[in-house]
């Protein structure tokens, strides 16, 4: 369960950070 959350976070956090910071 926890590794799945970590995998999803690792997949989506960069995209969210990219969208917020506008640094892609």
UniProtKB/Swiss-Prot annotation:
GO terms for biological process: defense response to bacterium; defense response to fungus; killing of cells of another organism. One of its GO terms (cellular component) is extracellular region. It comes from Lithobates berlandieri. The keyword Secreted applies. It comes from the Eukaryota. Antibacterial activity against Gram-positive bacterium S.aureus and Gram-negative bacterium E.coli. Has activity against C.albicans. It is found in: Secreted. InterPro entries: Antimicrobial_frog_1. Belongs to the frog skin active peptide (FSAP) family. Brevinin subfamily. Pfam families: Antimicrobial_1. Disulfide bonds join 18-24. This is Brevinin-1Bd. Keywords: Amphibian defense peptide, Antibiotic, Antimicrobial, Disulfide bond, Fungicide, Secreted. Expressed by the skin glands.
């Amino acid at each position: 369960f926890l590794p799945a959350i970590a995998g999803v976070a690792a997949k989506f956090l960069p995209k969210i950070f990219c969208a917020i910071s506008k640094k892609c």
